[in-house]
Amino acid sequence: MNTTTSTFDTEALRRGIEERDAATLRALYAPDAEMTVVDRNAPPSQPRVLRGRTAIGEFLDETCGRDMTHLLERVVVSGDTAAFTQACRYPDGTRVLCLAMLDLRDGLIVSQTAVQEWDA
């Protein structure tokens, strides 16, 4: 992982995800950011859309508060775009894989689309 190709802080992303630190993650988003989540509860025809750092922060608080492990498997940054894969595991063994695409402005996330797939 190379953290010198962009002003986007990939190490903060890793720390926030792997340490379940919602405050660190929240700081990576622009005040007017938008997050779109597609998963088993929010299909492509009706995705969950969160607007603004406050709404995104509430989502991150809830996610980081869950008893589970998070691993940032890979992150790629190219100019004003980034992508990452995240693997999660609940204590009962249930796994979740998240793939995310990010649009960046001034080193902050302005738009994120995340697709999450859960074990059946």
What residues fall within each predicted segment?
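Charged, low-complexity, helix/coiled-coil-prone segments
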Residues: 1-7, 40-47, 100-103
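Short, flexible micro-motifs
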Residues: 19, 23, 55, 110
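Short charge-dense sequence patches
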Residues: 4-15, 48-53, 109-112
